[in-house]
């Protein structure tokens, strides 16, 4: 390697005497005389400026020749060769640069170049460059930058620079192919916060996310080539602003569906939770239809009691003479009450209430009851008696109905009407027999026996046998039959009256509350009607409706 100002290898300076002889010969022949070295200053600061393999030689004019028209001649030398070569486009030029890209296109070789200044007939010495290695010394220009903005992001697309080509029609070669390890240093400047940050990338795309909306950002990029340090060449600064925050249509749809699905899920979970809670804590049991909650004020408690319709029994009082009833007939009367079986389905069917058939089959005449017993004080067509005290409810009689306090079924009690019938031809001492309504078209045979029994004693011409009078009280809860003994209203009470029947009834406990001891020692009042005495003797409360 030689230093600038020394002869190039293979070209030693000629001796002064030989040069003088050559000049004389050229002058004799009439040719142009070349410049003669006479101490003209040489160009300065001669260097290669290479960008993307475009190699240009630059220099400065001689120091003492500013403003003077000076021409320059350029030669180049390929490292490893033996002679200098003239640059085809850089002989006797007046500019201070020479493009040697064609001569130095092989970037894997090393080159030298030299420049000489010529003014009139004088010239300067050669000014040479240092060895130039394009592959290591060329500068890579910044890539092409394309920016795309979003609400909070900026997308940066980078395109690698191209290698210099002699003709535009030549094949394009990217600097990425020459330098596979080419990198890019991206710098972003926030104009609001006045902050800059850099990021080195190897790919051609960079997305900057989570930026501030509606903010101006400035971006510049420079190429980095691994190897010896090179002068950086940053790109031109490009600025772009992020978009304002806007609720786009697809975001609105996403929010809508999110809220909708969340609401549906919450509703389903709530419904399932409610059903589970109701299944666990809320009972589904229902009380039987025949039970109702009855509030009893006199006790202060509430109990369950069958809710069935109260049936009113028609009670017919027949005034019979004890003297006309024989013991045989009394036994038949007892037998008629005792032989009825509650388990007999035929019997139960025979006693189903049919009001239309029963109204005409009373044992007595209710319309003339008050004429015979009460002294014709009330002579209306129908006398209604209302009895209070059964199950703490009002029992309607006749055609007047009073709805009970609670709903009751019609198959628990039978509806009825208290009817009193007095036969004027019977004796003073009578027997009262209370019967329920006959609920079928054909009367029960046992009731027929009782009916015939009364007729027997009425039409009998022979006097009754003197037998001990027997009082019978019989009530069958299944059939509703109620047989009440005759009242001692005429002052003749048989011995041990009512004890036998009372003892039998008290054993079952059915009439324990209804039965009260009669008062045979009570003085008799002739003007007291039979209904009043019946109420006093039996402890009944009967309301007479006019």
Swiss-Prot record:
Entry keyword Glycoprotein: yes
InterPro entries: FN3_dom, FN3_sf, Ig-like_fold, Interferon/interleukin_rcp_dom, Type-II_Cytokine-TF_Rcpt
Extracellular-side positions: 33-253
Transmembrane segments: 254-274
Disulphide connectivity of cysteines: 90-98, 218-239
Signal sequence region: 1-32
Keyword Transmembrane: yes
Membrane protein topology class: Single-pass type I membrane protein
Main location: membrane
UniProt topological domain (Cytoplasmic) ranges: 275-546
Keywords of this entry: Disulfide bond, Glycoprotein, Membrane, Receptor, Repeat, Signal, Transmembrane, Transmembrane helix
Occurrences of domain Fibronectin type-III (ranges): 42-138, 139-245
Glycosylation sites: 45, 86, 94, 185, 203
GO molecular function: interleukin-20 binding
Subunit and interaction comment: Heterodimer with IL20RB and heterodimer with IL10RB.
Role description: The IL20RA/IL20RB dimer is a receptor for IL19, IL20 and IL24. The IL20RA/IL10RB dimer is a receptor for IL26.
Protein name (database record): Interleukin-20 receptor subunit alpha
Organism: Mus musculus
């Amino acid at each position: 390697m030689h230093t600038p100002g020394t002869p190039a290898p293979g070209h030693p300076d000629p001796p002064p005497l030989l040069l003088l002889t050559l000049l004389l010969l050229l002058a004799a022949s009439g040719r142009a005389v070349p410049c003669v070295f006479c101490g003209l200053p040489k160009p300065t600061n001669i260097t290669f400026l290479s960008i993307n393999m475009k190699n240009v030689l630059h220099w400065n004019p001689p120091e003492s020749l500013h403003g003077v028209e000076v021409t320059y001649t350029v030669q180049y030398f390929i490292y490893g060769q033996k002679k200098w070569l003239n640059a085809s486009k850089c002989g006797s030029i007046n500019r201070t640069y020479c493009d040697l890209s064609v001569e130095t296109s092989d970037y894997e070789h090393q080159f030298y170049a030299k420049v000489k200044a010529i003014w009139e007939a004088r010239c300067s010495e050669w000014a040479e460059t240092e060895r130039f290695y394009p592959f290591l010394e060329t500068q890579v220009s910044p890539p092409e930058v394309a920016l795309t903005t979003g609400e909070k992001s900026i997308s940066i697309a980078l395109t690698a620079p191209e290698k210099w080509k002699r003709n535009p029609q030549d094949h394009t070669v990217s600097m990425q192919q020459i330098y596979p390890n080419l990198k890019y240093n991206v710098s972003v400047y926030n104009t609001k916060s006045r902050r800059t940050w850099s990021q080195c990338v190897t790919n051609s795309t960079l997305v900057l996310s989570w930026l501030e909306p509606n903010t101006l950002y400035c971006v510049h990029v420079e190429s980095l080539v691994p190897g010896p340090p090179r002068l950086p060449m940053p790109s031109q600064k490009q600025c772009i602003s992020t978009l304002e925050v806007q609720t786009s249509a697809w975001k609105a749809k996403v929010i809508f569906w999110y809220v909708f699905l969340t609401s549906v899920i919450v509703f389903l979970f709530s419904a399932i939770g409610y059903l589970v809670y109701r299944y666990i804590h809320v009972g589904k049991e229902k009380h039987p239809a025949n039970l109702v909650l009855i509030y009893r004020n006199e006790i202060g408690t509430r109990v369950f009691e069958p809710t069935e319709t109260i049936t009113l029994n028609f009670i017919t009082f027949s005034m019979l003479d004890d003297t006309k009833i024989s013991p045989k007939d009394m036994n038949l009367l007892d037998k008629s009450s005792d032989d009825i079986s509650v388990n007999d389905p035929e019997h139960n069917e025979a006693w189903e209430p049919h009001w239309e058939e029963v109204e005409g089959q009373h044992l007595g005449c209710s319309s003339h009851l008050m004429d015979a017993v009460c002294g014709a004080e009330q002579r209306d067509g129908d006398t209604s008696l209302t009895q209070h005290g059964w199950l703490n409810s009002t029992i309607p009689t006749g055609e007047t109905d009073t709805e009970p306090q609670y709903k009751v079924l019609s198959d628990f009690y039978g509806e009825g009407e208290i009817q009193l019938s007095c036969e004027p031809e019977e004796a003073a001492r009578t027997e009262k027999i209370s019967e329920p309504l006959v609920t079928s078209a054909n009367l029960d045979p046992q009731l027929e026996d009782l009916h015939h029994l009364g007729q027997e004693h009425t039409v009998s011409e022979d006097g009754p046998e003197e037998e001990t009078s027997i009082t019978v009280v019989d009530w069958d809860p299944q059939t509703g039959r109620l047989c009440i003994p005759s009242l001692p209203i005429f002052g003749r009470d048989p011995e041990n009256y009512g004890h036998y029947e009372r003892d039998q009834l008290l054993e079952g406990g059915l009439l324990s509350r209804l039965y009260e001891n009669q008062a045979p020692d009570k003085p008799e009042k002739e003007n007291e009607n039979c209904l009043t005495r019946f109420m006093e003797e039996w402890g009944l409360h009967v309301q007479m409706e006019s």
